[in-house]
Amino acid sequence: MRPAEDPEPASPAALTVEKREGPQGKPPRRGRSAALAGGLAVAAGLLVLMAMASVALGARSVPLSVVLDALLSPDGSSDHTVIRELRIPRTLLGIGVGAALGLAGALMQSLTRNPLADPGLLGINEGAALGVTLALALFGLTDPAVYVWFAFGGAALASLIVYSLGSAGRSGAGPVRLTLAGIATGMVFTAMASALLRMDPQTYDRMRFWLTGSLAAPTADTLVRLAPFMAAGLALGLLLGRPLNMLSLGDDAGKALGVAVTRTRVLTGVAVTLLCGAATAAAGPLWFVGLAIPHAVRAVVGQDQRWVLPYSALAAPVLLLAADVTGRLIARPGEVQVGIMCAAIGAPIFILMARRRRLAAL
C-alpha cells in the first residue's frame, strides 16, 4: 500500500487568516461582534455625556435646563449667549480635534507597527504648528481656511523628515529610532516657530495660548472652515481598517492577500496629514491623546483595526473634553489650557508603559 503523503504546511498568512476567520472560513463569532458594536454605542453615550458637561460646566456652571433652553428657544440672555457662541463651538471643536488625534495615532501605530507613534512624539503636530506660525508671522494670514494648508504642508514635511531619519541605516525604522527622530525634529520645529514669534511680539501675544494647545475662543466660522478637512480625514482613516489588518502580517503577506501596499501607505499618510493638520490648525499642538487612547482601546478590543480605529475616534474626544473641563474647573474663573492638562494626564501613562517595557512593535 502506498503511504499517505504528509500535507503541505500552511503559510503563516494562511494560518493567520484561518485563525481570524475560523476553521472553515467562517466570520468571527457574532456574539463578539455584537459586544464590540455595543461598546461603540456605550462610547458614543459617554461622549454625549461629556459634551453636555463641557457645555454646562466652566468658570460659571449653568443648569442643564438653561442649556436646553439656549438650544431650543434662545432669548439673548447672557447665559444663552455664552452657551451658543462660546461653549457649544468649543465643545464641537474638542470633539473634532479629539477624534482626529485619536484616529491619527491609531493609524500611525498600525502603519509603522510602532507603539510609540503619536502625532506629538513623532513631530507631526510640531510641523503643522510651524506651518501655521509661518502663515501668521510672515504672511499675516488669519483665515483658518487659508493657513490650514500651511499646517498640512508642515505635517507632511515632518512626516518625511522623521521617516527618512528613522529608517536610515541597516536596522531600518525601528520604534525607538522613529521616536528619537520625531522628538529631535519636533524640537527643531518648535525652536524655529519660537524664533519667528520672538521677531513679531504681536503675533506671539496672539499665539502663545494656541502653542500650548487650547480650545478657547473658537468661532462657528472656524469650525465650518476646518470641518471638511477633519471629516475627509476621518472618513478616509476609518475605511483603512481591513487593509491595515492585512499589512500587520508584513508587506509580503499583505501582497499575497491582495492588499495594494503602496496605495494603503499613501492613503494612510494622507489621512494622518489631514487629521493632524486640521486639528493643529484649530487647537494647536496637543500631546499624548494619539498615544494613550489607541493603547487603551487595544487593551479592550484587541488588535483588529476595524474596531480599533472607530473606538479610538470615539474615546479620544472623551479624554480631551474631560481634560478641558477639568482645566476650567480647577482654575476658576480662569482656566488651564487643555494641552497642559492632556500632558499631565498622558505623561504618567507614557512613563508607565516605558517602565513595563511594553514597547515591542505591533
Where are these regions (language model features)?
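Alpha-helical transmembrane segments in inner-membrane proteins
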Residues: M1-L362
